[in-house]
Amino acid sequence: MKRYPLLIQLVLYFFLFILLLFGLIGSLYYQTSSGTIRQLTERTTRNSIDQSSQFITSYLKKLKQTTTVLSKDQAVRQFAQDKSADQETVQHLMRTMIETDPDLVSAVLVTKDGRLVATDSKISMQTSSDMMNESWYQEAIKERAMPVLTPARKESLTSEKEKWVVSITQEVVDQTGQNLGVVRLDIGYDSLQAYLDHLQLGKQGFSFIINQKHEFVYHPKKAVYSSSQEMQAMQPYIAVKDGYGKGGENFIYQVPIPDSDWTLIG
């Protein structure tokens, strides 16, 4: 009769040992799996953002080349120098550029003497003096005939009430380098959005672009462009260069876009 309690104790000890062993194995497996998943997440995010930065670099290079060609075109320079020149040639040139590049939505030339040529009638109704006081015009002159990128802004267009665009501006100069005016190309988000919104960043992952002033250039949620509250919500992501955000749930990775003041964050 005394042997049964001992046997029961041995069975219980063995059972508890098995449970403890399974618990230990499960814990080790969870930690290993969790670490593997985190490493995979980090690697996938870095690869996606690095590849995207190359796409954006090529995207910007093409747009900058278009702006440079326009700013240095002989017809544009001649019009900017000659007050009596007809704007039809310049307008035709700009419209041809818009029609052949799906990323472009409008083009503008503002001359130093206050004349304005635009491909969109709503923009044409604006006064050149107002444009000359805007930051994009002033920044273009500061950069001395080099392409300048603007943050996201709303533009009123004939085809639609308002559209979020970014712009590339460039100073127009004569052969001696003297200022003649500024050209501006307004760019829609279609190509950029189609690419960035399909990145492999997990179910809740997303990417956005800021400039060196932390102004938003692109974000899938357009509200951040005009909402200070939404902008503030993005600050924790902007603060992390390569690592996990507060709480350790979100992995964040940033890549500066070469030859620009843009930074891609995913």
Q: Could you tell me what each predicted segment is?
A:
Residues 31-64, 84-88:
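Juxtamembrane membrane-water interface segments immediately C-terminal to a transmembrane helix
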Residues 57-91, 110-124:
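Extracellular/periplasmic ligand-binding regions of membrane signal-transduction receptors
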Residues 99-103, 113-187:
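Extracytoplasmic/periplasmic ligand-binding sensor regions of membrane-associated signaling proteins
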Residues 59-69, 95-116, 139, 145-147, ...:
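Short N-terminal helix-loop-first-beta-strand/juxtamembrane motif that initiates sensory/input modules
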Residues 213, 221-266:
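Extracellular/periplasmic juxtamembrane segments that couple receptor/chemosensory ectodomains to their
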Residues 1-35, 39, 43:
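Extreme N-terminal signal-anchor transmembrane helix of membrane signaling/transducer proteins, especially
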Residues 87-99, 123, 178, 182-224:
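Solvent-exposed, extracytoplasmic
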Residues 127-133, 191-194, 198-199, 223-237:
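A short, polar/charged loop-to-alpha-helix boundary motif
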